[in-house]
């Protein structure tokens, strides 16, 4: 297939585009950031720009990764969050609708409130706790209301990108242990890590099935940030570093976080398409391949 990808320069895009290419798909990579070779400029917030590019490329599929994923920035700048995550998604969706193109929308387990004790599945009702989750959920609703052929795939705590792109928890912890021997990490929020490489492989398999719909795709198992930090220290071979568990109140942040973002890939399992491994094995591979 000829696949146009938005947000290609980010954590996920840097793993997904090569995965698609290795499977024989022709990838047209786009992003606001064109520092990497082979990436075409695209700001999804501008409808005419999106529509013109889709008409010009005539892809078989558009994979929409472009998003504002900084949860606190979304809370502090809600107009920016909705303009990027909701209106940007509407622009891509309308362009796909006009050309009858299949669309893939990457969403988040953060669309749930986080108060249930069982892992969330595709059949649970969303109720976002923060602006980021609301803006992504609005994107889901737009895709579902305007298209018949789509994949909406929710990811969990994303890990990947290496030193160049990983500005999230894992990258921060690895950078901290270069300077500190005592760290603190939150233990009262639980989630499902999602390795970009594994997610990309699973997504590539899914889009070749024609099983359109809404899916969860996270690595197997659940953990707290504290659990992740302990594993990072172990995998980095730093027995001299210790991490102390703290409550989330220790780190006051603008945006509320869900108590639980535990996810299960229920529909993928029912379809026999869930090949996501344990999060600890995925984390070890990520650290060994990108941080050592």
Question: What residue spans do the PLM features occupy?
Answer:
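Catalytic helix-loop patch of NAD(P)-dependent Rossmann-fold dehydrogenases
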Residues: 76, 83, 87-91, 98, ...
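Mid/C-terminal beta-alpha module of Rossmann-like enzyme folds, strongest
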Residues: 186, 202, 209-254, 259
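NAD(P)-dependent short-chain dehydrogenase/reductase
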Residues: 141-191, 197-198, 204-205
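N-terminal Rossmann NAD(P)H-binding glycine-rich loop of SDR-like oxidoreductase domains
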Residues: 3-23
């Amino acid at each position: 297939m000829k696949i146009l990808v938005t947000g290609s320069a980010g954590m996920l895009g840097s793993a997904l585009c090569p995965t698609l290419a290795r499977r024989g798909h022709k990838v047209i990579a786009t992003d606001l950031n064109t520092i990497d070779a082979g990436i075409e400029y695209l700001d999804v917030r501008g409808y005419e720009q999106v529509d013109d590019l889709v008409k010009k490329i005539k892809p078989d599929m558009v994979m929409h990764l472009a998003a504002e994923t900084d949860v606190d920035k979304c809370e502090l700048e809600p107009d920016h969050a909705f303009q990027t995550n909701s209106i940007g998604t509407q622009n891509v969706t309308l362009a796909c609708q006009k050309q009858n193109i299949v669309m893939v929308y990457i969403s988040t387990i953060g669309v749930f409130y986080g108060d249930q004790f069982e892992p969330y599945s595709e059949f649970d009702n969303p109720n976002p706790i923060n602006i980021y989750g609301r803006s992504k959920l609005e994107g889901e609703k737009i895709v579902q209301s305007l298209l018949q052929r789509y994949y909406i795939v929710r990811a969990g705590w994303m890990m990947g990108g290496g030193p160049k792109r990983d500005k999230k928890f894992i990258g921060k912890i690895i950078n901290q242990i270069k300077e500190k021997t005592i760290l603190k990490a939150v233990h009262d929020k639980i989630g499902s890590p999602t390795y970009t490489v594994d997610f990309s492989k699973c997504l590539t398999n899914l889009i070749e099935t024609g099983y359109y719909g809404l899916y969860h795709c996270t690595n197997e198992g659940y953990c707290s940030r504290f659990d992740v930090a302990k594993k990072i220290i172990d995998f980095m071979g730093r027995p001299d570093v210790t991490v102390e568990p703290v409550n989330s109140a220790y780190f006051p942040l603008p945006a509320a976080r869900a108590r639980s973002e535990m996810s299960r890939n229920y529909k993928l399992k029912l379809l026999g398409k869930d090949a996501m491994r344990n999060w600890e094995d995925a984390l070890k591979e990520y650290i060994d391949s990108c941080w050592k």
